[in-house]
Amino acid sequence: MTKAIDSGALTEPTFYILLSFYQPMHGYAIMQNVQEITDGRVTIGAGTLYGAINSLIEKGWIEALHNQPSDRKKEYRITQQGKQAFLQEVNRLQALLANAQSVINTANTKEA
């Protein structure tokens, strides 16, 4: 089994961090992007972010870009394996929502 298949559910911060890496970004830009995507509902601190970055690199889900030596900010991007893991999570969440909607619709039909 690949790591993407073994990934399990992503935490909400990890979900948004991985989503953000669909575009190459540096750490601070990720923190800003997550706040923007979630309308300020999710805020990621530097410790959480860089811990997640290290974990995602270890899993092979993101990679560092080779920037110019003069660049102070290190940029990262999602890998194919990271995209596979992310899309697996999106599918899991869609199935979860479909199950919930089915139960709600059935309950509403019985109440009517």
Regions found by a protein language model. Give the residues of each.
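Beta-hairpin "wing" of winged helix-turn-helix
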Residues: 57-72, 77
